[in-house]
């Protein structure tokens, strides 16, 4: 709530009433005429309530009606909507009743350009106005469109017809140069009745960011008479009162101290009792809408208009409930709580439907009781009884941890003829925040991150921000059961930093596929499945960490290298594979690799020698056999987390090949190794590669000194070629 609630000032009141000096005003806002006008049930709700407001003005013999925006729901009201509005204004605002408020300001201020009639309708001798209506525009009926006469709105039409006085319209600067020096100029409508002087300052709806800027910059200029302390000043605004963003609202304490009362439009919940503002002399009244345009909690508050009486610098406000507003009740149920408290079976859809029907029936009975109570008050006050109306009912259903739910539209069909909104009777939703699992555990949605340390300065926090670190901490809070946190972290980093859109999907698919293969081969019982998965995940994590640190894991050496670009044991080869633009040596991604631990010295530079070693002629035949073992090793090693999607694709193909089948084709594999070993740089163009053409491009990345056995070197060169080619395919 706002700070004004701390103000202990008593409600405003007029000590001695004097009709000759008291200005009586009927306050209303957000009528939204035309809302759901095509709905067969609710189509006439807004116009019926507007008719009641005009009738209340006549009944209470007010001096005029004051509206704070959104008279129409649509920016371009329909012909039928305009017809009914004009007819009602003519019916209730024209007549022989004399106007007792004197206009002191210029009657031509704001009049239609090029015409002689005044802006204030009761100053026109051709009209016989009994109750003037003053209104500003809202965000629904604001001026739009360029034209000869500038931007126009529906209120301009009512104004030139002589049935309404449009105020609060101003032109904003059209150029940046003018915007720097020109603000919002608010010119008042000055009225007097007896000894009471009233100044009305209307500010039609402006985008909240712009209004916030103008107020912060003190660029809202209110033109006031010289003896401003003798005037009672009312300010009409139509802006966000609730904070929706840093600048998407208007602070309550931003208005001038000379204002006595702020009439706030746009907010639909009724807070019509004047509320003081801490540190300010003025009060705020928020009449709220006269028709429910959304089935929200704020709309369920009883709708009111107000009778405002002003004498000198004193005022008092009397709320008047609206009888023609359709009754609206709203409630919420949590199925999970109902299961605990009432024994509801959340797995039985029929039982859930029966439970929800009972809740809706209770709400209908509640709405009926509300309607009867309202009618009883009206009859006591001497008003006519209003025929019953179908109520608006909204039941919000929290379906967290519930899988069986009803169809909302089909559910509402059973209440056809009993409620006014059968199609949106139910609204299903789930809780956004998960409950705490216990003390000491990290919250899933808001884990304790290392950058949240209160002892760190802003610069230190920014310096510690790393994708790898943040992802790892979030994944730790999720408590993954199948995927390893390290491998998933690397896959996400590949996705973020290197635009590898398939990294995450490929890593997940590969890990799950390998795990399923292991489970099928072991043929374990379902009771032991969780333990097996936990052990498999732990084994994957251990192998992954070992591979990333050593870079020479016997089973998944190439795969570990391909995904190890996060620092730690990352080698120069891994940088080449990750970028893959032909000039891998020119890339330096180590800036992002300083997250958690400093990388060890580049002792594995010898790894680049593996491809060069393939030049040796005796290494051809052994290279084929070594390659076969390496391929199968990569297939089994697919379970450790990885971010190299192409490697997974190649491994999937090789996993289906048995060892005997691979050995049965030693000649072709040996010939490819020979071609690669004899022509390193030109091998990129070698067309002889038909089965795995991507491997041909690896020759340009094959460079290293000799110093290892031809068998091992050829095997590692082959493994290195596969992963480098995968990066090429990804680009």
From Swiss-Prot:
GO terms for biological process: double-strand break repair via homologous recombination; double-strand break repair via nonhomologous end joining; meiotic DNA double-strand break formation; mitochondrial double-strand break repair via homologous recombination; mitotic G2 DNA damage checkpoint signaling; mitotic intra-S DNA damage checkpoint signaling; telomere maintenance. One of its GO terms (molecular function) is manganese ion binding. Residues 643-661 have a biased composition (Acidic residues). Keywords: Chromosome, DNA damage, DNA repair, Endonuclease, Exonuclease, Hydrolase, Manganese, Meiosis, Metal-binding, Nuclease, Nucleus, Telomere. It comes from the Eukaryota. It holds the Pfam family Metallophos. Mn(2+) 1 binds at residues 30, 32, 70, 268. It is found in: Nucleus; Chromosome, Telomere; Chromosome. Its cofactor is Mn(2+). Mn(2+) 2 binds at residues 70, 139, 238, 266. InterPro entries: Calcineurin-like_PHP_ApaH, Metallo-depent_PP-like, Mre11, Mre11_capping_dom, Mre11_DNA-bd, Mre11_N. GO terms for cellular component: chromosome, telomeric region; Mre11 complex; site of double-strand break. Residues 608-632 have a biased composition (Low complexity). The active site is at residue 140. Residues 543-731 are annotated as: Disordered. NCBIfam families: mre11. Core component of the MRN complex, which plays a central role in double-strand break (DSB) repair, DNA recombination, maintenance of telomere integrity and meiosis. The MRN complex is involved in the repair of DNA double-strand breaks (DSBs) via homologous recombination (HR), an error-free mechanism which primarily occurs during S and G2 phases. The complex (1) mediates the end resection of damaged DNA, which generates proper single-stranded DNA, a key initial steps in HR, and is (2) required for the recruitment of other repair factors and efficient activation of ATM and ATR upon DNA damage. Component of the MRN complex composed of two heterodimers RAD50 and MRE11 associated with a single NBS1. Belongs to the MRE11/RAD32 family. This is Double-strand break repair protein MRE11. The gene is MRE11.
């Amino acid at each position: 709530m706002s700070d004004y609630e701390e103000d202990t000032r008593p409600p405003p009141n007029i000590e001695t009433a004097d009709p000759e000096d008291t200005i009586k005003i009927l306050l209303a806002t957000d009528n939204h005429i035309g809302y759901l006008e095509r709905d067969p049930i609710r189509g006439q709700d807004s116009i019926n309530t507007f008719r009641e407001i005009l009738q209340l003005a006549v009944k209470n013999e007010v001096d005029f009606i004051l509206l704070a925006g959104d008279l129409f729901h649509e920016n371009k009201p329909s012909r039928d909507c305009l017809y009914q509005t004009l007819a009602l204004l003519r019916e209730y605002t024209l007549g022989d009743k004399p106007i007792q408020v004197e206009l002191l300001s210029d009657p031509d201020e704001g009049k239609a350009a090029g015409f002689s009639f005044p802006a204030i309708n009761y100053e026109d001798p051709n009209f016989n106005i009994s109750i003037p209506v003053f209104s500003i525009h809202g965000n629904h009926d604001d001026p739009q469109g360029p034209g000869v006469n500038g931007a126009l709105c529906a209120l301009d039409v009512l104004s030139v017809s002589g049935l309404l006085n449009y105020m609060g319209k101003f032109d904003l600067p059209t150029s940046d140069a003018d915007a720097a020096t020109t603000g919002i100029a608010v010119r008042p409508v000055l009225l007097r009745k007896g000894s009471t002087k009233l100044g009305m300052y209307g500010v039609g709806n402006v985008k909240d960011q712009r209004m916030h800027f103008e107020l912060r910059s003190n660029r809202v200029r209110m033109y006031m008479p010289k003896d401003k302390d003798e005037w009672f000043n009312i300010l009409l605004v139509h802006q966000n009162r609730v904070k929706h963003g840093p600048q998407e609202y208007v602070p309550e304490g931003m208005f001038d101290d000379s204002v006595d009362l702020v009439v706030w439009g746009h907010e639909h919940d009724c807070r019509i009792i004047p509320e003081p503002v801490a540190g300010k002399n003025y009060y705020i009244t928020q009449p709220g809408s006269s028709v429910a345009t959304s089935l929200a909690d704020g709309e369920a508050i009883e709708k009111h208009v107000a009778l405002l009486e002003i004498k000198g610098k004193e005022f008092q406000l009397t709320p008047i409930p609206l009888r023609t507003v359709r009754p609206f009740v709203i409630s919420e149920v949590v199925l999970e709580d109902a299961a605990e408290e009432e024994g509801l079976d959340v797995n039985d859809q029929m039982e859930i439907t029966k439970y929800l029907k009972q809740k809706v029936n209770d709400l209908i009975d509640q709405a009926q009781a509300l309607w009867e109570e309202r009618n009883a008050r009206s009859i006591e006050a001497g008003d006519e009884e209003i025929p019953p109306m179908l109520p608006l009912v909204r039941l919000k259903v929290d379906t967290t941890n519930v899988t069986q739910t009803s169809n909302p539209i089909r559910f509402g069909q059973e209440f056809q003829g009993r409620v006014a909104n059968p199609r949106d009777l139910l609204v299903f939703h789930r809780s956004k925040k998960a409950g705490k699992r216990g003390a000491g555990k990290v919250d899933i949605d808001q884990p304790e991150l290392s950058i949240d340390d209160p002892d760190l300065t802003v610069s230190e926090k920014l310096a510690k921000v790393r994708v790898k670190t943040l992802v790892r901490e979030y994944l730790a809070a999720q408590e993954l059961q199948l995927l390893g946190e390290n491998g998933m972290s690397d896959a996400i980093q590949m996705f973020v930093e290197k635009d590898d859109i398939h990294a995450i999907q490929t890593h997940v698919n590969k890990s799950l596929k390998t795990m399923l293969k292991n489970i099928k081969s072991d043929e374990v019982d379902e009771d032991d499945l969780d333990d097996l998965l936990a052990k498999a995940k732990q084994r994957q994590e251990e192998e992954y960490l070992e591979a990333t640190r050593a870079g020479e894991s016997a089973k998944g050496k190439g795969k570990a290298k391909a995904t190890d670009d996060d620092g730690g044991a990352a080698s120069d080869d891994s940088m080449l594979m990750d970028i893959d633009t032909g000039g891998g040596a020119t890339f330096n991604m180590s800036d992002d690799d300083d997250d958690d631990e400093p990388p060890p010295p580049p002792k594995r530079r010898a790894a680049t020698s593996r491809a060069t070693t393939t030049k040796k002629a005796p290494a051809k035949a052994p290279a084929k056999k070594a390659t076969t073992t390496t391929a199968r090793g990569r297939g089994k090693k697919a379970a450790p987390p990885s971010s190299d999607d192409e490697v997974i694709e190649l491994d999937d193909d090789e996993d289906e090949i048995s060892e005997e089948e691979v050995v049965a084709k030693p000649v072709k594999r040996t010939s490819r190794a020979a071609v690669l070993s004899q022509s390193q740089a030109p091998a990129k163009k070698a067309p002889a590669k038909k089965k795995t053409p991507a491997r041909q491009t690896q020759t340009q990345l094959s460079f290293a000194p000799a110093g290892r056995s031809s068998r091992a070197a050829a095997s590692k060169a082959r493994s290195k070629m596969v992963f480098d080619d995968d990066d090429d395919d990804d680009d």
